[in-house]
A protein has these predicted regions:
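Amphipathic, coiled-coil-like alpha-helical scaffolding segments used for oligomerization/assembly
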Residues: 165-232, 302
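Flexible, polar/acidic helix-loop-strand segments at domain edges
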Residues: 203-282, 364
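Entry/capping segment at the start of metal-dependent catalytic domains
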Residues: 2, 7, 43-139, 308-310, ...
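Second-shell loop/turn segments in exported
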Residues: 117-122, 161-169, 184-189, 253-262, ...
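C-terminal solvent-exposed extensions
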Residues: 94-101, 120, 151-155, 159, ...
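Extracytoplasmic
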Residues: 106-109, 125-130, 137-147, 158, ...
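Soluble non-cytosolic domains of exported or imported proteins
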Residues: 123-127, 157, 166-174, 192-196, ...
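N-terminal targeting leaders characterized by basic, low-complexity, disordered sequences
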Residues: 1-42
Length: 365
């Protein structure tokens, strides 16, 4: 029935409201016509390609955000390191032009490691442990060479004396120069670790497992008692003895068993065992370990150097090898000179042995 207009009296048909409310079923009524073409509104649909691109962008954004947080954390952590810059000129560090030229293209990085027991902030301390850490990417190895601290060498400006005196005289720069000049090395970086907190780091790792002879056990227990160290005695000897932090430090500092060469060997054993234990701990413990080590360390290495070496060491599956100087091939002897005991040996022969070990010059490779 047609509805009547109350003002004009005309009648008109009532529109179909239900169909008008559905804009798509009445699309012809709302379509825009231009010439002979009719354009209709329709929903936009994303293509599969566009969805993939958007998803990848979101994932990339999340990765970049996480990477930024991790990078900021690492930078903040590395800021705990004490920094001591070294001269950039190789000759200033005692590196000869011949040595620099010979090894410039080899992917082997040598870093001096100094262990000191300095309990005061202004105390440089003698290098109680002196080692060369070699990052050998050519043969995928980490090599650790310890040099006896009583080695008789020439120290620039001070004459002939013990090699560990160089660190006490003028710090790491002179110590590195002394190693380079006496062993034809090309060391341009160093890390110094304060041994005063070494026991705490080992305890954080859960202790270490190490070979201990019966003589070493007896001497260590005597030192524990004499020095009043608050720890349990070492109860057994053998190929794998579990040591706490204090026990391990006493073990490494034992000067009464086998002389200085065996003492440096014990120091290498402790460091090697710490390295193995550090790889075995849960990843959630790494931040605490890193904080403990860095807070007791000083270095000349940049953040990029540290990150590069650390990443390679963890991911490369590199094996660790060790050597000490002097050894049975160096014609070494203990001598008293001007009332002081020194390790005297053929430095030229020792240099050849050191280079063969680090660079594997005489290997089949």
């Amino acid at each position: 029935m047609k509805k009547k207009d109350r003002y004009t009296g005309h009648r008109y048909a009532k529109p179909n409201r239900s169909s008008e409310n559905d804009i798509y079923s009445n699309s012809d009524r709302y379509a825009r016509t231009t010439g002979n073409k009719k354009y209709k509104k329709r929903k936009k649909k994303w293509s599969a390609k566009k969805k993939i691109i958007v998803t990848l962008c979101i994932i990339l954004g999340i990765i970049l955000m996480i990477a930024g947080i991790v990078f900021a954390y690492i930078k903040a952590t590395l800021s705990q390191l004490g920094r001591v810059p070294l001269p950039e000129a190789p000759e200033t560090l005692g590196i000869s032009s011949e040595v620099a030229e010979k090894y410039k293209d080899l992917d082997v990085t040598n870093i001096a490691l100094f262990g000191v027991d300095s309990r005061e902030d202004n105390d440089i301390g003698r290098s109680d442990a002196l080692m060369i850490l070699s990052i050998d990417r050519v043969h995928n190895k980490i090599k650790l060479t310890s040099i006896a601290r009583d080695t008789y060498v020439t120290v620039d400006g001070y004459g002939q004396t013990k090699i560990n005196h160089a660190y006490a005289y003028e710090g790491p720069e002179l110590a590195i120069k002394t190693i380079n000049e006496n062993f034809d090395m090309n060391i341009q970086g160093f890390v110094t670790v304060n041994f005063s907190q070494l026991a705490e780091i080992i305890d954080y790792l859960g202790g270490i497992n190490i070979a201990v002879t019966e003589e070493e056990r007896e001497v260590a227990n005597r030192l524990i008692q004499e020095l009043g160290v608050q720890c349990e005695p070492i109860t057994k000897s053998g190929e794998s003895v579990h040591l706490t932090g204090d026990q391990a430090v006493i073990f490494a500092r034992n000067r009464d068993t086998g002389g200085d060469s065996e003492r440096t060997g014990r120091q290498r054993k402790v460091l090697s065992a710490m390295f193995d234990q550090a790889k075995a701990i849960d990843v959630t413990q790494y931040p605490g370990l890193i904080n403990m080590v860095l807070s007791q360390s000083v270095t000349s290495l940049s953040d990029n150097d540290m990150l590069g070496i650390g990443t390679w060491a963890v991911t490369s599956g590199a094996t660790m090898e060790q050597m000490s100087l002097p050894n049975e091939n160096c014609n070494s002897s203990g001598e008293i000179i001007d009332g002081v005991w020194y390790y005297v040996y053929d430095l030229d022969l020792a240099t050849d042995l050191l280079h063969d070990f680090i660079y594997e010059e005489n290997s089949a490779d």
